[in-house]
């Protein structure tokens, strides 16, 4: 039975994180920025699971941390979308550049 090396998991996680970081820094649509942040969190989850499974003492700690991170990411997405809906009702736009003032 062949096993996937740890470097493959880490390379995939780095690629996912870089794609998410690039999207979060360059895109102007707030929904896309939230999706890119979720992609970065998933890359971190992949690292947690890979190190847990392929480490010196394999155990379930990485999987448990990954599940906890997914719960936090779901809450973050819900709060982010709620804020986005409130801003859209107030400003009628979801562009990041348009949201530069606090009131008015």
Swiss-Prot record:
Keywords: Cell membrane, Membrane, NAD, Quinone, Translocase, Transmembrane, Transmembrane helix, Transport. The keyword Transport applies. Pfam families: Oxidored_q2. GO terms for molecular function: NADH:ubiquinone reductase (non-electrogenic) activity; quinone binding. It catalyses: a quinone + NADH + 5 H(+)(in) = a quinol + NAD(+) + 4 H(+)(out). The chain crosses the membrane at residues 4-24, 31-51, 67-87. GO terms for cellular component: NADH dehydrogenase complex; plasma membrane. GO terms for biological process: ATP synthesis coupled electron transport. Its main location: membrane. The keyword Kinase does not apply. NDH-1 is composed of 14 different subunits. Subunits NuoA, H, J, K, L, M, N constitute the membrane sector of the complex. Belongs to the complex I subunit 4L family. This is NADH-quinone oxidoreductase subunit K. It comes from Bacillus cereus (strain B4264).
């Amino acid at each position: 039975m062949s096993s996937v090396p740890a470097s493959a998991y880490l390379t995939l996680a780095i690629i996912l994180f870089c794609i998410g970081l690039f999207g979060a820094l360059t895109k102007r649509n707030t929904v896309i920025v939230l999706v890119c942040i979720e992609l970065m969190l998933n890359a971190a989850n992949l690292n947690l699971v890979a190190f847990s499974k392929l480490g010196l003492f394999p155990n379930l700690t990485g999987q448990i941390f990954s599940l906890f991170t997914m719960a936090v990411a779901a809450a973050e997405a819900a709060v982010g979308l709620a804020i986005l809906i409130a801003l859209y009702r107030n400003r009628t736009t979801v562009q990041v550049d348009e949201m530069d003032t606090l009131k008015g």
